[in-house]
Amino acid sequence: MVSYYLMILVGAVLVNNFVLSRFLGCCPFLGVSKKIETALGMSGAVVFVMTVAAAVTWCLDHWLLAPNGLGYIHTLAFILVIAALVQFIDIAMKRFVPPLHAALGIFLPLITTNCAVLGAAEINCRQGTGFCESVFFSFAAAVGFGFALVIFSGIREKLAHANPPRCFRGIALALVTGGLLSLAFMGFSGLVKLPY
């Protein structure tokens, strides 16, 4: 049992990383990765939202939508659940951590439309896994998102002191760096075989 959950963790963080393998959540990956502090704050917010959203959306889908034949509106219901969770985090951060709230800026409310969060809920719905597996997979996927975001922001902080050619400055260098990071993570492919 423990080895199965360890496989889910390794698979979601390294092998099938949401950002670097599935290309989900690229907007905050590029937008919040200029400083490690903001990347850590965004990672924490995404871990919380994705984990709680997985629990709530699993219950919603299995206890309300599927039994009543309302599966066709599950995406809309999932978006509403995610939006409510993001509002909760936004209010809590504004109250308790104002500097981090200001640093994240517009990207915090954009977690609502972060396709990684919605993607995790959709994957859990389609795979038909149990409650604990779904929540743990979403937690591991969020940790993988945060892991990639922090690594990428560390690289971008170092590159801020470099003097690249003019055509590579800004987002161009960030995209090339993200592509190289994605290639590096391809080295983990085949490490774990998961149904996700």
Where are these regions (language model features)?
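Ordered, amphipathic secondary-structure segments that act as subunit-interaction surfaces
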Residues: H62-G105
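Juxtamembrane boundary at the C-terminal end of a transmembrane helix
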Residues: Y4, L183-Y196
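Small-residue-rich segments of transmembrane alpha-helices in multi-pass membrane proteins
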Residues: A45-A55, G105-A120, G170-S182
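Generic transmembrane alpha-helix signature in multi-pass membrane proteins
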Residues: F23-G31, D90-F96, F107-L108, C115-G128
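Juxtamembrane transmembrane-helix termini in multi-pass membrane transport proteins
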Residues: V10-S43
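Interfacial loop-to-transmembrane junctions
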Residues: E157-V176
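Mid-bilayer segments of alpha-helical transmembrane spans in multi-pass integral membrane proteins
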Residues: L80-F88, F107, I111-I123, A142-V150
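Structural signature of hydrophobic alpha-helical transmembrane segments
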Residues: Y4-V19, G69-A84, F136-A148
